[in-house]
Amino acid sequence: FLISIPYSASIGGTATLTGTA
């Protein structure tokens, strides 16, 4: 999960990070 945060943020950006959270 912790790895998925920066990983997704690098691809989708803030939108993905907010969606995952």
From Swiss-Prot:
<keyword id="KW-0878">Amphibian defense peptide</keyword>
<comment type="similarity">
    <text>Belongs to the frog skin active peptide (FSAP) family. Phylloseptin subfamily.</text>
</comment>
<dbReference type="GO" id="GO:0005576">
    <property type="term" value="C:extracellular region"/>
</dbReference>
<feature type="modified residue" description="Alanine amide">
    <location>
        <position position="21"/>
    </location>
</feature>
<keyword id="KW-0964">Secreted</keyword>
<dbReference type="GO" id="GO:0006952">
    <property type="term" value="P:defense response"/>
</dbReference>
<protein>
    <recommendedName>
        <fullName>Phylloseptin Bu-1</fullName>
    </recommendedName>
</protein>
<keyword id="KW-0027">Amidation</keyword>
